[in-house]
Swiss-Prot record:
GO terms for cellular component: cytosol. Belongs to the DarP family. This is Dual-action ribosomal maturation protein DarP. NCBIfam families: PRK05255.1-1 (NF003593). PANTHER family: UPF0307 PROTEIN YJGA (PTHR38101:SF1). Member of a network of 50S ribosomal subunit biogenesis factors which assembles along the 30S-50S interface, preventing incorrect 23S rRNA structures from forming. Promotes peptidyl transferase center (PTC) maturation.
């Protein structure tokens, strides 16, 4: 007797394991949505029932209650366009990463300006032509004086604020 597998009999239905994996992915996505702030949740295309469930999520603090509520959110996620939600979440994550990267870059500028010499200041003025060189030199001197006397870094904060304002103006965010 010859046993052979006939591909024509494959109906294209998902296996039970595949369905379970997809449902677990929906629960994981729902858990990710619960960590978002309400203003970010408002940007996502969600049903009212899912919005209410996400708003109720912080109320469930016991482990079993939280797990049960996440299962409920996963059930509600079945009716959602998860591809659109994932796309928007990825955009939000990317914008957050870009913001953090820009923030760290501005911090590095501040630190180099305080520790550096005129060459660093000239490079900064080339990168940010709207910078007021005199004001920046004054803030740098104050910050260096504060560091020398172990005072709180008030001028350092002012430099960062000034640099951030210049950056936002240059990027058209102001």
């Amino acid at each position: 007797m010859v046993d052979s597998y006939d591909d024509s009999l494959d109906t294209g239905e998902k296996s039970k394991s595949q369905v379970k994996r997809e449902l677990h992915a929906l629960v994981d996505l729902g858990e990710r949505l619960t960590t978002l702030k309400p203003d970010l949740q408002a940007k996502l295309p969600l049903t009212d029932a899912l919005r209410r469930a996400l708003a109720d999520a912080p109320k469930h603090t016991a482990n079993i209650a939280r797990k049960r509520h996440l299962q409920f959110i996963g059930k509600l996620m079945r009716d959602q366009d998860t591809d659109a939600i994932l796309t928007l979440l990825d955009q939000l994550d990317a914008s957050t990463r870009q913001y953090n990267e820009r923030f760290h870059n501005l911090e590095r500028w501040r630190d180099r300006l305080i520790a550096g010499d005129d060459a660093v200041l000239e490079k900064f003025v080339v990168d940010y032509p709207d910078a007021d060189r005199q004001q920046l030199r004054s803030l740098i001197r104050q910050a260096q004086h504060e560091v020398a006397q172990n005072k709180p870094p008030a001028s350092s904060r002012k430099i960062f604020k000034y640099i951030r304002e210049l950056d936002e103006t240059q990027r058209g965010l102001r």
